[in-house]
């Protein structure tokens, strides 16, 4: 329920019902979700492929992220850059993102361009170009992105080191963007094998929300998408992360003005019943200036410039990560001590009904803000179908949150936010080299 849904009146959200979404599975295994919304003459179309860095292995890490880029570089019918050119010509825009578990392609366009978009999506899924010059060009782009977002980013390099330390067995160990040596050495066979298994119709959920009819969407899907042959899906990820038996620490020395500290705790996968209590816990601790951590660490003690907690959607058990930015002159140890004290207070002191209610309202407010737009609903429908196993759970968020008790929040705090279950990554500013 991450990044999700205040007291907005549900009667004003008549569209927020599972019956508004119609589904059909094509003969090649692609599942299509359609929600008609005729308020504006636009359409959001999202393709969720169940392929991410967890489906890679040492030697080929980063391939899923590579295809986030490569899918815009031409196919059999629509050549290099034509996807973007045609999209722009028709008044639309597009994007894509890659996670540990998924690669998602997003299209937003006028309803008049629906058939063109179906045709272009089918073209790149079925007949993506592997022109060697384009592959090498995109390899360079990805390598440059890695340098910018990881190697030359204090937060990026610390986050990468945190993941590598927190996961010793599971594929969440390596970064989504890939290790540098792997990016340099992918072969054409590596690329084609990964694309064939991951970007196949039977490994995809397509979501269409907007000024369309379900009949028109399915007719076009059967015309353009259904002829694409199914493929062998990615092999299941069998490796489970073993229980962590003690605190782990990693220190990064890097040129920086101020230290950074990331503190991670292993938590269950998204579809686990503890997801909702953990959402409330995370919100209670770090959502806004009235949250516990902000009031204690930013306002009262003035130890940090900012503090937040976050979890990502995850098909397998993941992490809750607390991020601390200590003020100038504040040792990271002082900041983390205050954090640990607040976590201890959460575990051992009663949570008031008022505080619990506030956290739930904040979550509902975030959720409904996303549900107001066709792009937000397309994204959430795909997330719930993939991560929760059923898009219909999107429409029971309020009931799920309402069932969370203060005792539930304290229970998950005691179960997961423990010393032996945490990994601490600290970036210590490195003094500038003196030149004699």
Show which residues each predicted segment covers:
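Short N-terminal segments immediately surrounding and downstream of signal-peptide cleavage
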Residues: 17-37
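Sec-dependent signal peptide recognition
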Residues: 1-7
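N-terminal signal peptide c-region/cleavage motif recognized by signal peptidases
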Residues: 11-16
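Short, acidic/polar N-cap/turn motifs at the starts of alpha helices
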Residues: 20-23, 239, 249
């Amino acid at each position: 329920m991450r990044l999700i849904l205040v007291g907005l009146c549900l009667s004003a959200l008549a569209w927020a019902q599972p019956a508004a979404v119609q589904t059909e599975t094509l003969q090649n295994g692609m599942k299509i979700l359609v929600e008609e919304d005729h308020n504006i003459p636009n359409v959001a179309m999202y393709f969720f492929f169940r392929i991410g860095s967890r489906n890679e292995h040492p030697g080929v890490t980063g391939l899923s992220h590579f295809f986030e880029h490569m899918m815009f570089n031409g196919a059999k019918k629509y050549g290099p850059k034509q996807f973007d050119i045609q999209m722009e010509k028709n008044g639309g825009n597009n994007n894509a993102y890659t996670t540990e578990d998924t690669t998602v392609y997003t299209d937003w366009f006028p309803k008049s361009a629906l058939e063109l978009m179906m045709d272009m999506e089918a073209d790149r899924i079925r007949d993506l170009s592997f022109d060697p010059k384009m592959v090498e060009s995109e390899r360079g782009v990805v390598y440059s992105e890695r340098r910018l977002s990881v190697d030359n980013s204090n937060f990026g390099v610390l986050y990468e080191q945190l993941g590598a330390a927190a996961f010793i067995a599971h594929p969440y160990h390596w970064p989504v963007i890939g290790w540098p040596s792997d990016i340099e050495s992918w072969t054409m066979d590596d690329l084609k094998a990964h694309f064939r298994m991951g970007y196949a119709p039977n490994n995809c959920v397509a979501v269409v929300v907007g000024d369309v009819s379900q009949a028109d969407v399915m007719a076009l899907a059967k015309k353009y998408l259904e002829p694409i042959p199914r493929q062998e899906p990615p092999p299941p990820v069998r490796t489970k992360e073993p229980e962590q038996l003690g605190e782990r620490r990693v220190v990064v020395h890097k040129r920086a003005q101020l230290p950074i500290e990331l503190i991670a705790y292993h938590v269950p996968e998204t579809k686990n019943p503890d997801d909702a209590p953990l959402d409330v816990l995370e919100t209670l601790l770090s959502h806004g200036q009235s949250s516990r951590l902000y009031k204690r660490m930013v306002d009262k003690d003035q130890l940090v410039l900012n503090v937040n907690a976050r979890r990502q959607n995850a098909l397998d058990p993941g992490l809750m990560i607390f991020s601390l930015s200590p003020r100038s002159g504040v040792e990271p140890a002082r900041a983390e001590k205050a954090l640990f004290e607040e976590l201890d207070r959460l575990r051992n002191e009663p949570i008031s009904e008022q505080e619990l209610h506030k956290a739930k309202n904040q979550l509902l407010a975030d959720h409904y803000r996303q549900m107001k737009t066709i792009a937000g609903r397309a994204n959430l429908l795909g997330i719930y179908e993939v991560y929760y196993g059923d898009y219909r759970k999107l429409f029971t968020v309020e009931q799920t949150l309402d069932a969370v008790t203060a005792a539930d929040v304290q229970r998950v705090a005691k179960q997961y936010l423990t010393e032996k279950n945490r990994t601490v990554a600290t970036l210590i500013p490195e003094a500038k080299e003196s030149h004699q």
